[in-house]
Amino acid sequence: MSIRDSIKERILILDGAMGTMIQGYNLTEKDFRGRLELLQMLNYQGNNDMLNLTRPDVIEDIHRRYLKAGADIITTNTFSSQRVSQADYHLESSARDMALEGAKIARKCADEFSTADKPRFVAGSIGPTNKTCSMSPDVSDPAKRDLTYDSLFESYSEQVAAMIEGGIDVILIETIFDTLNAKVAVDASISEMCKAGVDLPVMLSVTITDLSGRTLSGQTLDAFLASVSSYPIFSIGLNCSFGAEQMRPYLKELSAKAPYYISIYPNAGLPNSMGLYDETADTMVPQMATYIDDKLVNIIGGCCGTTDDFIAGYAKIVKGKSPHIPVEWPKEIILSGLEQFRLSPEITFVNVGERCNVAGSRKFLRLIKEKNYEEALTIARKQVDDGALVLDINMDDGLLEAKEEMVHFLNMVSSEPEIARVPLMIDSSDWSVVVAALKCVQGKSIVNSISLKEGEDSFIQHAKDVLRYGAAVVVMCFDEEGQATSFERRIEIASRAYKILTEKVGFPAQDIIFDPNILAICTGMKEHNSYALDFIRAAEWIKKNLPGAHVSGGVSNLSFSFRGNNYIREAMHAVFLYHAIQAGMDFGIVNPATKVTYADIPEAHLKIIEDVVLDRVEGSDELLIDLANKILEQKDEQVENGVNHSSSDQEAWRSESLEERLVYALRKGISTYLNEDIHEALQKYSRAVDVIEGPLMRGMNEVGDLFGAGKMFLPQVVKTARTMKDAVAILQPYIEKEKVGGKAIAGKVLLATVKGDVHDIGKNIVGVVMACNNYEVIDMGVMVPADKIIKKAKEEKVDLIGLSGLITPSLQEMVNDVVAFKEAGLNIPVMIGGATTSQLHVALKIAPLYDSPVVWIKDASVNPSIAAVLLNKRERENFCKELNKTYECLRAGYKEQQLKILSLDKARENKLNLFE
């Protein structure tokens, strides 16, 4: 029976620590040296992998002790059996022998204990080495690397080949602190398995370095899962760093999200002040039992500080217990930088920042030529601040060494967490540059691009490279006959490429992004007039006929004919995107700081531009050219008369009423006049909070409506949120002054944006409104896991908990939170708010899981009144009765509605028959 069969039937036991057990043998320097000819000036004690060569009897004894204790899987003593790690001891030439002998020793012991009923397996241990591909060893030189992908690949390949020869059953890549190192190990493992003609399961085990829930190289668990999602992984788990109890929230997250078997082998608790581990088998076994009872795991074992006593205890508690059933991976494109990006339903469009492209930004090109990387990074940072969800990086210029510049800049980016948190788009026409770039990013990137231009063989090889390095891909609609310019050619090439990728390469459909070519219109050539419309039609066809695939394009190409007229260009882009997104375009390389939105365009201009973009009126291109010329002439006249065009526009909206000015400022993301207008509002409104609840909330609601209608995009919403924060900051001192001195605190409320969600503007407004009403507010920020909320709620003895979330996955996270609250014994009322939340969702999914009230809050202004009722014992009882009645009505209505929905088979029976 193979391990793939065994794991379906029961929970498997992995062995415990090797180093801890070795310490018990009190070995000396002489034991480590054995008969090897070694340098006298070096101390080899502690280089445990040497013992495979010098004291194999000790390693055999340890394996046998674990097998006797009940281990199903023993781990080879090869954690550091690779040249990179052994270089510290000048033993590079012995690394392969250590790996080979380590595998042979474990194989021998496993075979001794294997039976038909209980087969024993050998996991070949691959450690992370003592160096990292993703981080600089020198704080003064962030682009420097001690280790390259290629050198580590060579080192790991030698180790894996030796372990396969030695007879391992599984490859275990463990104690992962840098995802890029792990990707190299997976790549080397797959490569060596192909050479050897074997297919071994690959296990990954991550180390969370602190309570932030991130790896040492900065990735969240979500981001890590995205980074390795292209690989054939057998299991994913956690080891080292923490004890069992501290791993609980991270294990629950993995079990809920990872489409693999789940492993956990924690340390024997946290080390004490002497560096020793205080947990014993008796104290840790019950902790592990809870994970088994909750069906969170498939493989359990031990790391630092654990011994065969721990494993014997684990063997008893797994008997008769059901293993974890892996979840399915979402059929959506999921990317990552330091954080995960998931194209979920509420994200209608992914704006890819275009300014870090030497071909598209003269400033960026100049900075790269001048080696002014720090300022070049500010361009990247500004795009992220402006709402870019992905960053395009391109170094293709005849006067640049593109490969060197790409690698250097990407290494610089990885040192900037605020930039590195978003995924990257690797953009180059030189395939060697693309490969070099993929070898220095730990996240899941997008390659821009591949095509059939050089034929099918080249296309397949490039696609395999993309898959090998764990990326998604942009596919240009370009083949051996040239670039597709008509609708028919676009869909012909897309269909052919999709079939090759999914059927011949095995590329995940959701990781394919087609670029059907956005080409310039209004060029004076009639055959170009339909280019935009044909792109839109092609986008719609791709989404309907190529399941899972996405559509992207370089939007600025569309308006190339109007260089120098930014208003016309941005207006054309806004109109094009409005229609293309509705047709299915979900990615686009754009300037995230664009100022013109679809809603801003005057009706007369809008008709002309739509006629051109949609090619619906002959001669409309001439009308657009006339409009562009008039705008330029007006600008020239104003310059001659000493009038600034932009200032005249400002005067127009500045003459509106105070409320309209504030709404306009929010909608456009303009902070310039906020100080002036807020102080005028303070003279008009009796309380500072009334300014928030009045014109500012109205502005936010308008932005929400425009965003929902597709007339504003995420970068513009981000600017609005930033402007709202600025407005609240101006009002804050006045809010503090207006608090009634000496008045008793109305209550203590804890606010948090749930784990996985970085949006905080709504939560921040709630905090201000609650503070104005004399509530003490404890704001925990964004991406807050349940365990931290519980801990803070207990420490502060809060009266209310407010959970906020903007994105769809936050709905499930809120469900998880209240379940955790109940398990922790909390009976604190919970208020739920955020753009994707609803009273129906609370009634169906959240409220039934919690014993105390869970209340959906429509907007910030009603929070204080709801809170006051919840904290008044007399009023709370009646309120909860009415609330429960409301929830029961909602549930009953939903159930009745669901009963009216026929099954698919029944609906097919009722179909209209046109042939009788």
Where are these regions (language model features)?
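Domain-level signal for soluble alpha/beta catalytic cores
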Residues: M1-E916
